[in-house]
Amino acid sequence: YINSRDDELGIFGRLRVPYNYSANTAACFMIKKDIYNKIGGLNETLEVAYNDIDFCIRVLKEGYYNVFLPQVKLIHYESKSRGLDTTSEKYKRFLEESKYMYDKWKDIIDNDPFYNPNFSKKGWFMLDKNKER
């Protein structure tokens, strides 16, 4: 959770317990070599954005889990080495990679098995007021 303090619990205590997610960031992940090879590694056509998400979804589709471990602390300076997507070329690449991901993984994006269906998809952890109960 971006900018969370060490003493925060997170929604439903998720910052304190191991939890499965459809995808985690590759800024810090570990996976057995044989599973990495079985999955086919990172999709190198996704140059910057989403290669980790694509990988994690393929891991999930093979029946494995992407587990967040709260006891691991990491500080990651997003875009520190490559810079921000502020040029028109970088932004165009980002849009193309976003489209690729949505086209390929629409089923997971629209029906994430680890996201509470009562939450809105338009904001973080907000109840969807338009959903029938």
Question: What annotation goes with each model-predicted range?
Answer:
Residues Y1-D34, K38:
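A recurrent flexible, glycine/aromatic-enriched loop bordering the glycosyltransferase active site
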Residues E8-G13, G41, N116, M126:
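Glycine-centered flexibility motif
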Residues P18-A26, L42-N51, T87-K90:
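Short, contiguous acidic/charged loop-to-helix segments that flank catalytic cores in large enzymes
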Residues C28, C56-I57, Y102:
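Generic hydrophobic alpha-helical scaffold/packing signal
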Residues M30-I31, N37, N43-L46, Y91, ...:
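Generic secretory/membrane-interface signal
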Residues I31, D54, E96:
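Short Gly/charged-rich anion-binding patches and loops
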Residues Y36-N37, E44-E47, I53-I75:
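Catalytic donor-sugar/metal-binding loop of nucleotide-sugar-dependent glycosyltransferases
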Residues L60-E132:
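Active-site-adjacent helix/loop segment of glycosyltransferases
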